[in-house]
Structure formats: C-alpha cells, structure tokens
Curated annotation (Swiss-Prot):
GO terms for cellular component: plasma membrane; proton-transporting ATP synthase complex. GO terms for molecular function: ATP binding; proton-transporting ATP synthase activity, rotational mechanism. It is a peripheral membrane protein. HAMAP family: ATP_synth_epsil_bac (MF_00530). InterPro entries: ATP_synth_F1_dsu/esu, ATP_synth_F1_dsu/esu_N, ATPsynth_dsu/esu_N. F-type ATPases have 2 components, CF(1) - the catalytic core - and CF(0) - the membrane proton channel. CF(1) has five subunits: alpha(3), beta(3), gamma(1), delta(1), epsilon(1). CF(0) has three main subunits: a, b and c. This is ATP synthase epsilon chain. Produces ATP from ADP in the presence of a proton gradient across the membrane. SUPFAM superfamilies: Epsilon subunit of F1F0-ATP synthase N-terminal domain. PANTHER family: ATP SYNTHASE DELTA/EPSILON CHAIN (PTHR13822), ATP SYNTHASE EPSILON CHAIN, CHLOROPLASTIC (PTHR13822:SF10).
C-alpha cells in the first residue's frame, strides 16, 4: 500500500476534495503527471481535463477541471482550478456550450496566434468530452 499524502482540489465556488490520498493524476500543461507522497516540489499550469484521485481507502474519484494551477510539495498537492466538478455531475449542456464558444472564438480570432490558442483550447475540450461522456 502506497503512503498517503494531503490533496486538495479547490474551485472558486467550493472546496471539492481535502483528504489523504495515495495518488493523483493531473492534466498538466506539459502532459499528465502522477503525484504521490514525497513528490519533488513543482508548480504547473493545468489544462482542461480529468483529475483522477486514488483515495487512501483504495477507491477512485474523478473530477473535470477547466484550467488552473497545481502546487506540489513533498507533503501534499493543492490544485486551484478555474472550474471543477465531479465527473458524475458533469452537465452535458454546459460542456456543449463551452465547446461552441471555443469554436466561435477560433472562427473570430483576429490573428494566427489567437486562432492557434483558441483551436488548442477547442481540441482540449473535445478530447475531454470524449474521455468523460459515453458515446
């Protein structure tokens, strides 16, 4: 059994998780990363994706996050999300709205840099949609 550490997932609305966990997989901007006890100190940005939490009791919980930051230290990990919700509580209409807004942002972009950023965000959202919603 892996050693537990403190994990907190915080959104502007509320504290979603504050407990001892075995591991957390977070969608870092440079790729997914697994955090465990005694992890080297890191601060990273979070892209839209799924956070998978393996609890100290052996269960698994999944949360959708829409950007933010993760502060990782040897004793724990705090993820400050721009928006977060449990996968089981995902609102399909809200996700569809976010995807539509991202499509409009890409179409309305004034320059190549803005278009590229909007298209990247749209790609992340559609990948997220495929990962959490059944066909």
């Amino acid at each position: 059994m892996a050693e537990a550490f403190k994990f907190e997932l915080v959104s502007p609305e509320r504290l979603l998780v504050s407990e001892q966990v075995e591991s957390v997989v977070i969608p870092g901007a440079e790729g997914e990363m697994t955090v465990m006890a005694h992890h080297a100190p890191v601060m990273t940005t979070i892209k839209p994706g799924v956070v998978t939490v393996k609890t100290a009791s052996g269960g698994e919980e999944r949360y959708v996050v829409f950007g933010g930051f993760a502060d990782i230290v040897p004793a724990g990990c705090t993820l400050l999300a721009e928006s977060a919700v449990a996968v089981k509580d995902v609102d399909r209409a809200d996700l569809a709205r976010r995807i539509q807004e991202a499509k409009e942002d890409a179409a309305d972009a004034k320059d190549d840099q803005a278009r590229s950023k909007a298209e990247q965000f749209l790609s992340q959202l559609t990948t997220l949609e495929g990962a959490i919603l059944p066909a």
